Structures are given as structure tokens and as C-alpha cells.
Amino acid sequence: MLNSFQHLIVYVLNQINRFPLIGNKNKFSMKKRVTGIGGLFFKTKDPKAAKDWYKKHLGFNTDDYGCTFWWKDKEGKDCSTQWSPFAEDTKYYEPSKKDFMFNYRVENLKELLVTLKEEGVTIVGEMEEYDYGKFGWILDNDGNKIELWEPIDEAFK
């Protein structure tokens, strides 16, 4: 039986291919901020057992990191969303005390972090850059850690 958080994960993952988020068209100085959901991360007692359960019962194509869902954005570009169970003792979500963390796909992460800081948003740590994209972290109004990702989707192909 799924708990409410697991129902949320399944619902969001089912919606990704149907209604991918397109950039916010608003009065902010940046044309786009969040362009989609980059990942859904949650704590579990046994990440391997969670991956096995989702593979067996829901057909997730899991690997060491979880499951990657591929979809296309408005322009037809390949995009990915990562689903990943983490060990319940992970420190990765800190300073948040929650059992989950959302990752949002963004454009121009460096500029976005500057803008968010100017708007009074708490920035957690320094931006990091890898061959699969740039990452930054913020806290929302409830103290939830949010991961921002400027992806290089081609690195996963």
C-alpha cells in the first residue's frame, strides 16, 4: 500500500509527460525561471528495496540512482526528470528536516541565484558545476531545501 507521499510521487511522474512545465511568463526580469521538474527525491529505510518495489509494481526502469524519465519540452528538446530514493540518514537535504526534496530545472542558474538572493531568498552553499549541469540550492518559505538544476541532458544519453 502506498503512503500519501508515494501517491504524490506517482501522480507527479504521471503528469510530467502530459503537462511539462514551461517557463513562467510573468513580470520578473528573467524570461524563465523554472522550466520543469528535474527530480523527486525522498528518504526511505532501504533505497534498494524501494527501487525494486517501484520496478516490480509500477514498471520503473531503475538503476543505481533511481529512475530517469524522458520527455520533450515545448521546443521538442529532450529533457529528463530523475526519481531517486535516498537513505533515511542522508544529510543531502539539510538544513531542511523534511524527508523529501524537489529539484527544479532552470535556465541561467547563475543569474537566477543572484536574482533570488536580491529578492531575499536564502541560498544554501555555492553553485556546483558538473558535466551534466549546474546545481544550486535554496530554502523556500517553509525551510524546505530546493535543488535548482541547469541541466545538460545530453550527458545522460
Model-derived features: positions:
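Short hydrophobic targeting helices and cationic amphipathic motifs
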Residues: Q6-L8, L13-Q15
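Vicinal oxygen chelate
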Residues: M30-G39, Y65, L113-K157
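Conserved short beta-strand elements that form part of the metal-binding/catalytic scaffold
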Residues: G59-K97, I138-N141, K145-I152
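Acidic di-acidic motifs
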Residues: D46, N108, D140
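Core segments of cupin and vicinal oxygen chelate
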Residues: K31-T35, F41-S84, E118
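A cross-taxon signal for low-complexity, glycine/charged-rich
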Residues: Q6, P20-N24, S29
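Mid-chain, well-packed structural core segment of small domains
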Residues: P95-L116
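N-terminal amphipathic/hydrophobic targeting modules at extreme N-termini
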Residues: M1-L2
